[in-house]
């Protein structure tokens, strides 16, 4: 990006873009335990703590911890159980993420962490925040790996994780994850499209074309469908 800016007409725009990248880039830190038996790398970003995974790992006062406890208690009482409370905040988190409301999405998944810090969906959701909001593929992958080990993973977990590995240009790592993803969600067209990409990038054209054939029958999303047409041409599938 720096090279492009040196020769760019719009130098002010490039300078601003570089500033945004610098602000978004995570600060390096140590490993922190964020649930019993669960440790992650402490990564923070230049945005309000509520917009960051795990509230930016901020040290909370006794009063703030008490407010968290009150929130969790009230939510459980309102919904009827801890499981239902988790389901409520998670649904709001995914809805906000799908609408591009990243601050709200982060807040909801952070609230899910307060409600049930051991659950897989907490790390799945915050991995999506790390990837989409901050472009931090390393942290996203770390959280996806945690999510794989925690209770009650969503069926979409491996599909989302495999996609991140593809975006990170790691098709060899992505393929086994995506092979499992299409077993978990055999009707999810996008997972088949991503698997086809991984197979093709790993040199297995025939297997890639086989995945293309399945993907075409599963109605992938519009963006994935465009990728599918391009991939089919590149792989010269029949």
Indicate where each model-derived feature is located.
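Bacterial N-terminal signal peptides that target proteins for export
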Residues: 2-15
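N-terminal leader/linker segments that initiate helical-solenoid repeat arrays
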Residues: 28-95, 99
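Terminal, low-structured helical/coil segments at or just beyond the last alpha-helical repeat
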Residues: 32-51, 66-68, 201-238
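TPR/TPR-like alpha-solenoid repeats
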Residues: 129-130, 164, 198, 231-237
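Register position in tetratricopeptide repeats
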Residues: 98, 132-133, 167, 201, ...
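Alpha-helical adaptor scaffolds
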Residues: 114, 118-186, 190
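Canonical tetratricopeptide repeat
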Residues: 125-126, 160, 194, 227-231
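Bacterial N-terminal signal peptides
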Residues: 12-24
């Amino acid at each position: 990006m720096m090279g492009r800016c040196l020769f760019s007409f719009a130098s002010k725009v490039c300078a601003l873009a570089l500033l945004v990248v610098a602000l978004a880039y995570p600060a390096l830190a140590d490993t922190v335990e964020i649930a019993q038996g669960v440790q992650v790398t402490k990564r923070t970003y230049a945005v309000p703590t509520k917009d960051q995974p795990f509230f930016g790992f901020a040290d909370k006062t006794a009063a703030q911890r008490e407010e968290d406890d009150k929130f969790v208690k009230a939510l459980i009482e309102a919904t009827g159980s801890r499981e239902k409370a988790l389901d409520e905040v998670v649904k709001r988190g995914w809805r906000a993420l799908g609408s591009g409301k990243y601050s709200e999405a982060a807040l909801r998944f952070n609230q899910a962490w307060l409600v049930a810090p051991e659950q897989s969906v907490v790390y799945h959701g915050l991995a999506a925040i790390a990837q989409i909001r901050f472009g931090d593929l390393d942290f996203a992958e770390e959280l996806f790996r945690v999510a794989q080990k925690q209770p009650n993973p969503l069926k979409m977990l491996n599909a989302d994780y495999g996609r991140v590995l593809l975006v990170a240009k790691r098709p060899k790592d992505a393929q086994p994850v995506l092979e499992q993803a299409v077993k978990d969600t055999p009707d999810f067209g996008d997972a088949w499209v991503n698997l086809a990409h991984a197979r093709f990038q790993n040199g297995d054209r025939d297997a890639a074309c086989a995945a293309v054939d399945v993907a075409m029958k599963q109605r992938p999303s519009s963006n994935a469908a465009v990728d599918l047409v391009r991939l089919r041409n590149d792989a010269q599938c029949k």
